Each structure stands twice: as C-alpha cells, then as structure tokens.
Amino acid sequence: SAERGRLDVQLASVLDIDLDPTRQRLLLDSGRNAGVQVGQAVIDAGGLMGQVIATTPSTASVLLLTDPDHAVPVAVARSGIRLVVYGSGRSDALHLADVPLSADVRPGDELLTSGLGGRFPPGFAVGTVGTLRPDDSRAFLEADVTPAAQLDRGRDVLLLRGYKPVPAVDPAALPPAPVPAPGAPAAVQAVSAATNPPASPSATATTRSEPGR
C-alpha cells in the first residue's frame, strides 16, 4: 500500500525471549543509541510481531502479540470486517473474540492490521483464522488465530520507522481495566479505508479499550 511504501525499517537481533504464559516479550540488541523509540512496531518476514514498550541505550523490550495483555485491531483481508485479536499467552496462537454470528469471517481468512487506534500501520499480516466456534455466551463466535510471524523462532526482526504510532504502555504500569462493553465493531469496510480511520480509543497494551473477551 502507499502507507507501507513510505515506511523505513531498522534491523535488530533478538537477545532474549520470554514466552511465559503470563508474559510474552522479546529483548532486542538495539536501543535508544540506535534510534529505537517506544511505540515502534516490530515485524519479521511473515508479519507483525509486536511493539516496543521500553528502551535502554543499548536494548529494547518488545511486547509480543501473544502476550495476554495485548490486543490489536484487525481487518479481514477478504471482506474488510473489523475485529480485535487478543494475546492468548501461547506463542503459537492468538485469540479472535466477539465475532458477530452474522459476520463474514471464515476459517482460513487472513487478518491484517486495520490501523485503528493508531498503534500500527494498516495492512500488515497478523494471522490466519482457524475454526470458528460459539463462545461461552453463545451470542458471538471465537477462533484461534495462527500468527503470521515466527514469534518463537526468529533471530532477526525489523523495526518500522517513518510511522508515528500511539506509544505502547507496559501492562504492569496500567490501572485495572474497566468492565468491557459487550459486542465488537463489525462494520463492513474495505481494508484500504483503514488508512484514514475515524478516531478510536487506542488498544494500547491492551487494556481492553477495544471490546473484551
């Protein structure tokens, strides 16, 4: 897309990875001295990995998509439906929740960043939808999502530059999340329209600003 065409990237290597079910992070070998900033999106050849949440002069800490306190607004590449994907605490799966029963979402659909919330540029691969099933309320559907990025195996990553995101916040620094409102936005919109989305609460470090599970 035109938005992606304006982006620059910066290479970094993974120093350490933490895949505890309650904490999914990367430690990179580049920090403030290399121009790394809190809020930068991190990708690999497959797709989105997460976002920088802290830096030192020589390192950066990345909150992975799979962290249970993380969520990212997405759009279904095929239909444009806008939904939210949550971290599951597992490096091999994300959680798609609050899918309306009538939503045009199918197993195998590719999910892309929608750009809503201002944290990530639109159009980056997030994952692939698995089997849809009713959630506990029976009023919505949910599904596991296979991440597009190799979150547990990559040695080198790319940090996006040339995009001004809403900074991420370390979940440990956040106040308790409010009770989420039921339902999820499901307006049918073209993915390309996400390049200029309406104002929306940030899903930053996912405080359940987006509808919760």
Residue spans for each PLM region:
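A secondary-structure micro-motif
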Residues: 1-213
